[in-house]
Design a protein with these regions (language model features):
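OB-fold and OB-like single-stranded nucleic-acid-recognition modules
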Residues: 1-87
Length: 87
């Protein structure tokens, strides 16, 4: 399991690096893409339907996500493999 990191640090990591982040899903962008935010900044995340596992998350809820950095020439996003609502 990767150690908790920040959005700012995750954006600097290599493609396919496993990351775990704690923060909030602040808005829906399109399809299965969302904006994730922590104290260091924001990053686009991709969360497939099955990863939600029936959980309902609002922008006020804190979540932990784990997945992989997905980098291309223009952007960095996180491909989320696990999402957990923090109570």
């Amino acid at each position: 399991m990767p150690t908790l990191t920040t959005v700012a640090k995750a954006k600097e990591m290599a493609d396919d690096t496993r990351v775990e982040l704690k923060g909030k899903i602040t808005k829906h962008i399109r399809s299965d893409h969302y904006e994730f935010q922590d104290a260091s900044g924001t990053v686009e995340v991709e969360i497939d339907h099955k990863v939600w596992a029936g959980q309902t998350v609002s922008p006020q809820d804190t979540v932990e996500i784990s997945g992989e950095v997905d980098k291309d020439a223009w952007s960095t996003e996180i491909d989320v493999k696990r999402l957990k609502l923090v109570k």
